[in-house]
Amino acid sequence: MYSNLFYHKYSKNIHSQNGEDGVIEELLKRLDISGGWVCEFGAWDGIYLSNTFRLVEQGFNAVFIEGDVTRYNDLLKTVEKHNITPINAYVDHNDTENSLDNLLSKTAIPVDFDVLSIDIDSYDYQVWKGLKVYQPKLVIIEINSSVNTNVEYINDSVKCMGTGFKPTYELGVEKGYTFVLHTGNMIFVRNELFHKLNIRYDNPLENFNTNWGGR
């Protein structure tokens, strides 16, 4: 099945914004993953527009990271009812105490955990690029979908912009991942797992879903 057809067939929102809940559920089903670990930041209360909270409701363990103190307090209310490890920190894209590798090392999450969702509206690209130790099976990363797929645009500020499709795709390849589909976010799977998905496309850089989020 072509990935855009896959998106429109399985797209479903329970907590997510652009159909990721249904898409991720089907991808994990094809990967034979029915439980495990997820990580998401900035998580806010862990529920609102989350790409992974539906999995938490289904029994997955989670590490949710939120830097804003008020929003972190909202997250703590969610933690009381679920298997969530909360972290109050802003993830740094440099090799510091608050790098994603260092923050995750203080938790029980395994190196090859199941789903990573990166959605911080700025240096998402740099955070994933800086992740060296942990190798999640699926990566969901927000991009600037208004940038043409052939433009090499990398956001280098904390403004709510995001990096374009092309450099994010290239980063995934560099890190050993295969691009699966675009929902407004880009979803990647580790190379050795892609064959299980039964998803195809002709040219990844042309596989930008112009109708993402029902647009």
Regions found by a protein language model. Give the residues of each.
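Conserved acidic-Pro-Pro-aromatic motif
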Residues: W37-E40, R54-N61, V111-I118, S122-R215
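Hydrophobic, Leu/Ile/Phe/Ala-enriched alpha-helical segments that form helix-helix packing faces
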Residues: L28, L104-T107, G172, G176
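Distinct, well-ordered alpha-helical segments
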Residues: N98-S105, V127-K132
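Helix N-cap/coil-helix junction residues
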Residues: I33, I109-P110
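SAM cofactor-binding core of SAM-dependent methyltransferases
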Residues: H8-L103, I118, S145-N148
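Juxtamembrane luminal stem/stalk of type II transmembrane Golgi/ER carbohydrate-processing enzymes
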Residues: M1-Y7
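Hydrophobic transmembrane signal anchors and adjacent membrane-proximal interface regions, especially
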Residues: Y7-H8, V133
